[in-house]
Amino acid sequence: MQRYQLGRIRPSSRYAAQFPDQVPVDITRLPTLDALFALVQRAGNRQVRFDIETKLSPLAPADTATPEVLARALISAIREAGLATRCTVQSFDWRTLQIVQREAPEIRTAYLTAQQRWLDNVSPLATAPDAPSPWTAGFNLRQHGSVPRLVHAAGGRIWSAHFADLDARNLQEAHALGLQVLAWTVNEPTQIQRLLDLGVDGLISDRPDLVRAEMARRGLPLPRATPVDAAPPADTQAPPAPPRP
């Protein structure tokens, strides 16, 4: 995968049309997780958190490692870097989240959901209406009645929902259950404003510049910037992560 450059969107693609303001960073390769951890540690910012998504599908098991292999490799990398308290593992495939909760309870998990026409990972399949969705690790939406209650039943503390699925009712229900609520992927100013007005606990966005601008307009505290091109003073540098076996 490191043969591919990630620093520039293919100009003729529809994706490029969605992000005309993207600033290219040529000769950018896909980093390993270890390399990403080391990069942020070199910047000296101890507040940066890592939101790591496991990418696998119960509908295409041959395409990736098993949930067990993937989750355990991720747990190992996080622990070796000493960053367990600064990492959250999120996934649409809740099997990996269940493994992380059992085997690394110090690492937070976030339950990704969507109930859209183009993606629905919580509703039963039309071919098996009484069975749980293959994505939800055996937890059945029909038995629990709502997505917030489904996430809560799975042991989740963070519900990360598609922004269009969130409204005042289910946000209030989630908060009453003790869940934090994140919205993804929020890129338009009107969407950002609506969700901040609604009272979500966090936003996932491809446009952090727009999110920060709206937060600043509202007088909300902004996360500290993390330049990574200048090394911090020697006494603030974190040691590099140990080599992986």
Describe each region flagged by the PLM.
Residues 1-108, 115-116, 130-143, 152-162, ...:
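Metal-dependent phosphodiesterase/phospholipase catalytic core, i.e.
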Residues 111-112, 119-245:
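C-terminal active-site rim and adjoining tail of enzyme catalytic domains
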